[in-house]
UniProtKB/Swiss-Prot annotation:
Mg(2+) binds at K201, D203, E204. It is an enzyme of class 4 (lyase). The lineage of its organism: Eukaryota, Viridiplantae, Streptophyta, Embryophyta, Tracheophyta. Keywords: Acetylation, Calvin cycle, Carbon dioxide fixation, Chloroplast, Lyase, Magnesium, Metal-binding, Methylation, Monooxygenase, Oxidoreductase, Photorespiration, Photosynthesis, Plastid. Transmembrane segments: none annotated. The basic functional RuBisCO is composed of a large chain homodimer in a 'head-to-tail' conformation. In form I RuBisCO this homodimer is arranged in a barrel-like tetramer with the small subunits forming a tetrameric 'cap' on each end of the 'barrel'. This is Ribulose bisphosphate carboxylase large chain. Residues 1-2 form a propeptide. The keyword Flavoprotein does not apply. Its main location: plastid. It comes from Huperzia lucidula (Shining clubmoss). The modification N6-carboxylysine is found at K201. One of its GO terms (biological process) is photorespiration. Its EC number is 4.1.1.39. One of its GO terms (cellular component) is chloroplast.
Length: 475
């Protein structure tokens, strides 16, 4: 008899409330290659043993509820239940533990990040027995990851499409983020692209507002892009934000972008939702569009150390749902991001096989079994003086995006783009010659500025600008 129909009459039904740990805490369990594994940072309420708290997490995120129900006898709970198989105390923290939970693969719909998250980070996060709960990491088994298409194209295909190799790509978010007319917006795009940038970008706030409707923006941006391409001989792109209030409207905008012949569109994947994002990724793969992903709203979810979801989990979810770029912090700019933590999830985005490394916050070995990689985007409060550090930290397979660091140049957008391109080329050349970017970075930028007045002006404007605040999310 199948597990779905078997009835355990021999056991009988005993109504009442049982401790979760009697069923869901299984310290002798040996995890399977097909299990989805989760690491939760949990802070139990006073008086709640960690074993009971960990078991409650496993129960409430899988088959359990607060009381025994007679329909438990109509299925095989041993087959479907989540299991808390290990608990460890967090060093230096009082009453805080890492609970490791294994979930059988049958609990989750194939190819659906939405269903995965609904279970694992659903109602359990409001459970009263826990003061706080944070999902630190997930291990996605190959048997499950192969049910997703992942990024529409991936790093190598993007390199081949753009014919750009051996260096990071350069981008810029058009500012002011709101208020420009479509024609002035298109002019700003043109100036940046002709100055030497590879990409320009819609701000995540830009959708289709009264001051600039989406179709007008698309038309003026496409004109600017093709004009810059013709003048420079380089392939250019602009991230046209197709995020919309309905999926039907989103798809209409993506279709218009494809008809205009632009190479890339953009989506706000957290505010837009995983279902819409996965559908858009499928559309982009089928229609030859690259997909840039912005993470607006992520800090609401991931910034607090004790509660929420760590960004490394959101990054893994995005790689499965689909995106060719995603914003990943800068380490050196104005936005949150500790170096070791950031490089940990950058590797999870780009690499095929990532070993467990607790020093970088990676709780599980992750094998993506040849799923295409995602380019991390460094963006937020960066300028020419940051270029050596960014090149050294992120390497070639990245997008370095300077918004204010381009458009804030005293001579205008095109000189700002020139300054950033000169700085990048100088850093790549110095690195390839064996120079130490971390130690000699400022000297390398000064040397390049001798031959570029645009770079010299940028260096003078931003020489005193620093964002030196301690990161909230540390190991």
């Amino acid at each position: 008899m199948s597990p779905q129909t078997e009835t355990k009459t021999s056991v009988g039904f005993k109504a009442g409330v049982r401790d979760y740990r009697l069923t869901y805490y299984t310290p002798n369990y040996k995890t399977k290659d097909t299990d989805i594994l989760a690491a939760f940072r949990m802070t139990p309420q006073p008086g709640v043993p960690p074993e009971e708290a960990g078991a409650a997490v496993a129960a409430e995120s899988s088959t359990g509820t607060w009381t025994t129900v007679w329909t438990d006898g109509l299925t095989s709970l041993d087959r479907y239940k989540g299991r808390c198989y290990e608990i460890e105390a967090v060093t230096g923290e009082k009453n805080q533990f890492i609970a490791y939970v294994a979930y059988p693969l049958d609990l989750f719909e194939e190819g659906s990040v939405t269903n995965l998250f609904t279970s694992i980070v659903g109602n359990v996060f409001g459970f009263k027995a826990l003061r706080a709960l944070r999902l630190e990491d997930l291990r996605i088994p190959p048997a499950y990851s192969k049910t997703f298409i992942g990024p529409p194209h991936g790093i190598q295909v993007e390199r081949d499409k753009s014919n750009k190799y051996g260096r990071p790509l350069l981008g810029c978010t058009i500012k002011p983020k709101l208020g420009l007319s479509a024609k002035n917006y298109g002019r700003a795009v043109y100036e940046c692209l002709r100055g030497g940038l590879d990409f320009t970008k819609d701000d995540e706030n830009v959708n289709s507002q009264p001051f600039m409707r989406w179709r007008d923006r698309f038309l003026f941006v496409a004109e600017a892009l093709f004009k810059a391409q013709a003048e420079t001989g380089e392939i250019k792109g602009h991230y046209l934000n197709v995020t919309a209030g309905t999926y039907e409207e989103l798809l209409k905008r993506a279709h218009c972008a494809r008809e205009l012949g632009v190479p890339i569109v953009m989506h706000d994947y957290l505010t837009g939702g995983f279902t819409a994002n996965t559908s858009l990724a499928h559309y982009c793969r089928d229609n030859g569009l690259l997909l840039h992903i912005h993470r607006a709203m992520h800090a609401v979810i991931d910034r607090q150390k004790n509660h929420g979801i760590h960004f490394r989990v959101l990054a893994k979810a995005l790689r499965m749902s689909g995106g060719d770029h995603i914003h990943a912090g800068t380490v050196v700019g104005k936005l949150e991001g500790e170096r070791d933590v950031t490089l940990g999830f950058v590797d999870l985005l780009r690499d095929d096989y990532i070993e467990k490394d607790r020093s970088r916050g990676i709780y599980f070995t992750q094998d993506w079994v040849s799923m295409p990689g995602v380019l991390p985007v460094a963006s937020g409060g960066i300028h020419v003086w940051h270029m050596p550090a960014l090149t050294e930290i992120f390497g070639d397979d990245s997008v370095l995006q300077f918004g204010g660091g381009t458009l804030g140049h005293p001579w205008g957008n095109a000189p700002g783009a020139v300054a950033n391109r000169v700085a990048l080329e100088a850093c790549v050349k110095a690195r390839n010659e064996g120079r130490d970017l971390a130690r000699e970075g400022n000297e390398i930028i000064r040397e390049a500025s001798q031959w570029s007045p645009e770079s010299a002006a940028a260096c003078e404007v931003w020489k005193e600008i620093k964002f030196e605040f301690e990161a909230m999310d540390t190991l």
